Amino acid sequence: MEIKDLENKIINADCMDILKQLPDKCIDLVLTDPPYNASNSSITCADKHYSTINAEWDKNFNPIPYLEECKRVLKDGGSMLFFCTYHLLGTYLNWNGLKLQQVIHWQYTNPFPAIAKVYSPAIEYIVWYSTPNYAFNKEFAKTNVILNNKAYQVDGGKFNHPSVKPSDLIKKLLLVHSNENDLVLDCFSGSGTTAIACHRLKRRFICIEKDPEYWAKSVERLKHEQAQMQLF
């Protein structure tokens, strides 16, 4: 399969199956939100429903094989950005396959309430690895703390996903760590936000989602986005 056949598509597959088909050093930026090993049930608080993660795919996840395979397909001059919570942060920090450049803190002001005798979590981490001569557009980067509300739903509640990332957050990361026409890989594309942000910012993308329901809905989101863009 030619890499051109995969570009600008959201693919319904196990990402490892697709990664193994990609040639070495073909990706400019890996930007992805893998499982967290943080499974729990959803909760209802007052008039709000907060969907937390409670799925088999979020249990016993080992990021190392994915880090290794993403490293293989990353170009010289590329970066990898992996979202995580404290559950797996140590694993990411201890991996030495690429230079650990920095840990970015995404702090949100609307966390869901704590369901145990602990603080409400209001931070997720973005672990940034790089190769030499990586892209870094400093005009879009201020500090390694990004303030942005957490998204619990997209498209007015039509698409519920337990780990939705706000489009503004993904756009900011793309602006800092990539350039127009770069090829971006998202191995766990979920609600399709990376694909949509890439489309808006003129980045090429390969997005992969294993869950058929999330995949189908994200493809519809992307089609709607593409249709809207054609109107202008």
Which residue stretches match the model-derived regions?
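Core catalytic lobe of class I
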Residues: 1-216
